Amino acid sequence: MSHLVGLVRAVQANYYRVRLREPSNGVEELLCVRRARLKKMGQQVCVGDWVVVSHPDWPGQRGAIAEILPRRNQLSRPAIANVDQILLLFALADPPADVHPITRFLLTAEGLNVEIQVVFTKADLVSPQEQQQWRDRLQQWGYRCHVLSLTQGIAWQALRPHLANKITVVCGPSGVGKSSLIRHLTPREDIRVGAVSDHWHRGRHTTRHVELFPLAEGGWIADTPGFNQPELPPDPRQLAAAFPEIRQRLSQDQCLFDNCRHDQEPGCCVRGNWERYPLYIEYLHQLETIASAEPSLAKVPLVKAKSDRQGQQRLEPLLDAKKYRRRSRRQQHQHVNPMAEEVLDSEW
């Protein structure tokens, strides 16, 4: 029997909805569990993973995930794999656009090495002049952006060609219209949409878990549970590469020192009067402070390589010797003898 390969469409508790690449026996999707072997090896199954399914129960439409195929990339929070592009949504008003959170989301997306699309929503709440100002601003940063209004039906259909045949992840702060956009793009009626809080001027987030929704033009789109403070790159040396403005300057010139931090070093070609440079310096100092305070911790391996009779290597879970190793006969006798002595002592 050939292997069944499918795409993990949703994860809830310990169950995974897997859409089969090729439907079989009239079944397109299986509700699966993760094999214990994968759990012992510490391999987490993410939405967006391509997996091998074993032991299908066609009448019950169930199965077990036996293997996770190699990933091209992975978004850590929330966990979603094999992303083709990031759709970053920000509101022009209610809540108003802010350079700081926009930049932090962009830095997170840059770390994935995938295409980035920037979308501004609620265009009906600001003037055309302000809409154009943000378009020009993003262009100076190195990004193209779309401006739309879901309530007025402005320009959202123009997004469809950019989503075809791709796995697209929709990210952004709460209350900017992520769930509303997905509801416009997909036929699903069970996507919850919430209003912005009148007191906090922030969104009441309605997405509870990560899920891929199919698009009519092919491809998948995922809403993500909101996170208001996306993470900066873990290594300060990676920060500069996440700014298109810095990449553009380094492509035209070079700094005097190869290890230039683009801060106070002489002969730096990056330092200058561009809008987000103060943000770069602020984030650089934050990361350097964190890096100097945290000692490097070596990760304990969870798997070991073992060769079979054909000489092919396969991975097996590396079990805790103290927990799983069987006692030798000598150890068993050593354990039994003191017990026997205690019995003899009690008889006397």
UniProtKB/Swiss-Prot annotation:
GTP binds at T121, K122, A123, D124, G172, P173, S174, G175, V176, G177, K178, S179, S180. The keyword Electron transport does not apply. Keywords: Cytoplasm, GTP-binding, Hydrolase, Metal-binding, Nucleotide-binding, Ribosome biogenesis, RNA-binding, rRNA-binding, Zinc. Disulfide bonds: none annotated. Its cofactor is Zn(2+). One of several proteins that assist in the late maturation steps of the functional core of the 30S ribosomal subunit. Helps release RbfA from mature subunits. May play a role in the assembly of ribosomal proteins into the subunit. Circularly permuted GTPase that catalyzes slow GTP hydrolysis, GTPase activity is stimulated by the 30S ribosomal subunit. Monomer. Associates with 30S ribosomal subunit, binds 16S rRNA. This is Small ribosomal subunit biogenesis GTPase RsgA. It comes from Thermosynechococcus vestitus (strain NIES-2133 / IAM M-273 / BP-1). The gene is rsgA.
